[in-house]
Amino acid sequence: QGDMPIFDPGVLQNLVSKIKSEDITTLVCKANFDEISDPNVVKAVISWDKNDDDYGTALYFSRTQVPYNALTYWHHIGIYAWKRKSLKKFISFPVSNLEKMEKLEQLRALENGMIIKVVKTKDHFIGVDTQKDLNKVRNKIKNQSESN
């Protein structure tokens, strides 16, 4: 993902290993406290699989704090694994109303009945959407290079 300069490609192995027959699979991690109210951090509402704590189905994505009063909020990491036929299907849909409101393309898939599966990761990646985010990434890179 172009806006995540510090990304562990090993996480992709976990994502790919979870692809089953669903349309789309994506990643989430626990949101930090300061991310919960940040509209640049997309939150995911998930129904977790009863047999696999790290795997679930996305019910909704939002830039707001959803679900209300949750104990844990899930930060959506904008990396997707697609089935080829699902991607072709997705691009055939017009931009949806929820997609326009939230400015989140994955809502187009949900509004059209596509299934988005979610894989939990412990890794937390910094997406660069603002100058503040860029400063965080620069500091992290600087700290990593100083510790080496």
Language-model-detected regions and their locations in the chain:
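Conserved alpha/beta core of the MobA/IspD/sugar-nucleotide pyrophosphorylase nucleotidyltransferase superfamily
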Residues: 71-148
